[in-house]
């Protein structure tokens, strides 16, 4: 009996070692194929993009989005937000007259149609002056209304022809319109389930095997689970021919609610003359090394 037990134990240990060696080889193959890289926010300025930020409530989606603003406003001077309820996090980041409250399907469709018309007029004016205008539409927690919005689907599929980029903040991939998923350029995961990621990537054009991407995504999420980490998968165009998964985190100033006044000043709005009143209504602290120069920009 002791010899039989010893033999069984030896066999069990042998199989365990083989199992871990196989998995270690698999991990090494994936790591050798795909690289984890710091996300280059400047790449978002190269061409129109369609980004999806997916994660549960409190996962850090909005804070990360706000961290992108200091980069995005270099190109996108017209930023519009669509949200069902007032969110104070956007105070000081988007002009109040560019925030659309859409509590119903009809309200979303109506406001998007109006916005599209205004974008077309603005582009025509800019072309007459031999200039270019770029637009960014943000949809925060709009839910199932996104998947049923025909105008949004048009923007996802053809928005690049209107110099328009799209950012969707969703708690689940199900809220991303099925007819627009093939045109998503950036998928940002905030600790979502692998099954949700798999469903999202099914339609998205990516470089490399989706199975390897999902394994790499799972490894990064598991290894860095204590951080509010954005794991970003780019499409086959934005990845610049590389097999890579990018990671990024929110900026410290944004987390600490230190507002950079230049973010608002860089955007176009008829409300610029009311900037001081708008800033006084927020409870954030200004983080601006040269407030006097910014004030001159406002008056000009």
UniProtKB/Swiss-Prot annotation:
It comes from the Viruses. Participates in viral DNA packaging and virion morphogenesis. Pfam families: Pox_A32. Coiled coil: none annotated. Belongs to the orthopoxvirus OPG160 protein family. This is DNA packaging protein OPG160. Interacts with protein OPG137. SUPFAM superfamilies: P-loop containing nucleoside triphosphate hydrolases (SSF52540). It comes from Monkeypox virus.
């Amino acid at each position: 009996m002791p010899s039989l037990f010893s033999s069984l134990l030896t066999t069990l240990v042998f199989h365990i070692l083989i199992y871990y060696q196989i998995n270690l080889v698999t991990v090494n193959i994936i790591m050798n194929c795909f690289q984890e890289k710091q996300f280059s926010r400047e790449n978002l300025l190269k061409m129109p993009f369609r980004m999806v930020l997916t994660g549960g409530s409190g996962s850090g989606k909005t804070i990360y989005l706000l961290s992108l603003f200091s980069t995005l406003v270099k190109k996108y001077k017209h930023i519009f937000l669509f949200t069902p309820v007032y969110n104070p996090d956007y105070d000081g980041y988007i002009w109040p007259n560019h925030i659309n409250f859409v509590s119903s399907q009809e309200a979303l469709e109506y406001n998007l149609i109006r916005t599209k018309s205004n974008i077309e007029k603005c582009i025509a004016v800019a072309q007459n002056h031999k200039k270019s205008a770029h637009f960014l539409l943000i949809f925060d927690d709009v839910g199932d209304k996104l998947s049923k919005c025909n105008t949004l689907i048009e923007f996802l599929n053809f928005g690049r022809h209107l110099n328009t980029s799209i950012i969707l903040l969703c708690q689940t991939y199900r809220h991303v319109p099925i007819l627009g998923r093939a045109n998503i350029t950036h998928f940002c995961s905030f600790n979502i389930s692998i099954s949700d990621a798999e469903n999202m990537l099914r339609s998205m054009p990516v470089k490399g095997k989706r199975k390897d991407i999902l394994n790499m995504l799972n490894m990064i999420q598991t290894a860095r689970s204590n951080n509010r980490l954005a794991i970003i998968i780019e499409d086959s165009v934005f990845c610049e021919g590389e097999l890579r998964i990018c990671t990024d985190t929110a900026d410290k100033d944004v987390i600490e609610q230190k507002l950079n006044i230049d973010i608002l000043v860089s955007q176009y709005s008829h409300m610029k003359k009311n900037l001081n009143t708008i800033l006084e209504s927020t409870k954030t602290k200004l983080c601006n090394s040269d407030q006097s120069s910014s004030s001159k920009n406002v008056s000009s």
